Amino acid sequence: MPASLRSTLYFSGTNALSMALRLIGDPIGKFYSSPDMVTFAKRTNKVSVQKSITGVLVSSNHQVCSEVLKSPNWLSRPFAERLYTGPTTYTPETIHPFLDSIIAIDGAEQRRIKKLMQPVFTPRVIDSWKETSLRIVNDLFSNVKEHGEFDFVASIANPLPLAVICEIIGVPKLYWEKCNIWGRTLAGIGLDLPKNNQELEELEATSLALTDLIGELLAIRRVKPEDDLISLLASAQTDGQKLSDKEIIASVAFTLIAGFETTMNLLSVGTLALLENPDQLALLARNQELIPNFIEEALRLSSPIQFVVRTADSPLVLADGTKAKAGQTVILNLAGANRDPAVFDKPDSFLIQRENAKKNVSFGFGAHHCIGSLLARVEAEVMWRELLRRFPDVESWKLTGTPKYRSGKLIKSLESLPMSFRVSQPSAF
């Protein structure tokens, strides 16, 4: 069967199924029809685990989500294979930024690759990137000072993590803007999935362009290594085994996408939360030691990744007693779990002094815990400290337009955040 016909049938079938499930009020139908995952959680909060007629389980329960995320018996790979090989022209020779990376690999193989990547993301190494982050932040804020009114996403939240992760990986500045465009496309269409043949073609072309560039950089680093992630992975080995080129390219591609997309979302939605809650902004300005906890509360209130999917490797029992068969899939609503009223008092309120904000599940747990979570937190802390230092008159911080969200269910992401503040002499501290 021609690939185009196969993908057309796939999209037609998927759309028809989602429509039917919506009409009968099935949990997966509500999943598709809900504007966001917090709304979905509120529509389905009567029981801790919902079961679709398709056999898929869905949970917004904090305990259920936490225990599944921590368990090595709930796998990422099976669903990823169904997802990314369904409509695509994927072959074993194709390098897929998601399917071939640690996000979609389980067990010993995942641990092997992650172990080789880990030296770049240790607390000591991440701490050394604070100075780089501050340098980039200062450059970005220097441009903002010239006009006062600006789009926070375009001016700060996007370019800061993009520059940091590109420097960590070893991408020459010449290619940063291309990586930005490719990363946004792959995070949007790739993670939320293409809806038609046109989006599928764009996704596959973008994936090929990014992996080709990384392949070229890898070839250069094998001859002339530098102090970056590509060079590290090119030479790293464990138990006498090195990573294959395919493993390196996929791992670097995914690190690039995840490394700036999730941090960008954290920076933008966290700043929006401050603008929408001036009492909390004033409190943060007076007590900047609260910044780390504020970051956790921002992650809780608006999880960058809204949900993840896992598959049981054997008959298992969820935290609420629900039995899952081997091969059964569960959708974990992270955004809903972060608003679970059994765990978080006043779950819809943004409270930077919330004592248990760290219980958020936004970066996951266990084997698939986000390897770059510490880097994201460090970048966020550097950015907000400098923002408050340079622009201490927080009463002048204002929205100047309506924030615009990108379409998509998996990623909570602002497209634009128009704001302004009065430029004044920055504090010395």
Each model region followed by its residue ranges:
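Cytochrome P450
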Residues: 1-429
